């Protein structure tokens, strides 16, 4: 939000007023579906403001407070669902709170569990239930000794040593570059399925 009156710079970006950021990639699901897996959904701006409000250094109506202070998770999921529908993906999923707590070695466990296990499922159910969708447990395969990353030109496969093994236009074609000893684990995550009828409804009329 470069033209918002307030000015906030986070440690992640060199541009100001980034309201929310998402780190994600496309993974294979347990049933062969293409799943947009969210590894991180975060608002540095909102997090900083909430800390300042809790310490009495800021009021919710102050100029430095970001817009959508409480609504940013819902806004993030709307954008993610629109992107997934536009790309023709079969589902959107996100890691559990326990995965996030493990990643950050227990730091902010209460907030991570609240966001990933309660807030995101609640917002997805609110938006998708009228379209026949519901948050459920999905299985996704996560590589342990290689990586497949989406780029502007398709997909690239890397080894654990960060060596580029190959590139392709589609995820299916990129899999030919996975090493013979490549290994994946099946993780249970939160998610919502997006059948074709729901994708069309999202793109046609929104939420």
Language-model features and meaning:
Residues 1-207:
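Charge-dense, intrinsically disordered terminal/linker segments
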């Amino acid at each position: 939000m470069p033209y918002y009156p307030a000015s906030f710079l986070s440690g992640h970006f060199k541009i100001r007023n980034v309201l929310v950021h998402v780190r994600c990639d496309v993974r294979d699901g347990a049933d062969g579906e293409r799943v947009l897996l969210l590894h991180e959904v975060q608002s540095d701006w909102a997090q900083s403001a909430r800390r300042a409000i809790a310490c009495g250094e800021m009021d919710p109506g102050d100029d430095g407070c970001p817009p959508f202070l409480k609504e940013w998770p819902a806004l993030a999921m709307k954008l993610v669902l629109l992107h997934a529908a536009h790309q023709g993906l079969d589902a959107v999923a996100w890691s559990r709170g326990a995965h996030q707590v493990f990643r950050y070695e227990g730091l902010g466990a209460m907030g991570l569990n609240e966001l990933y296990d309660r807030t995101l499922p609640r917002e997805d159910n609110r938006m998708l239930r009228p379209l026949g969708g519901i948050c459920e447990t999905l299985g996704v395969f996560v590589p342990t000794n290689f990586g497949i990353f989406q780029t502007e030109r398709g997909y690239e496969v890397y080894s654990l040593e960060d060596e580029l093994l190959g590139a392709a236009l589609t995820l299916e074609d990129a899999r030919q570059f996975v090493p013979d000893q490549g290994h994946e684990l099946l993780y249970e995550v939160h998610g919502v399925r997006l059948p074709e009828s729901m994708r069309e409804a999202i793109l046609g009329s929104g939420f």
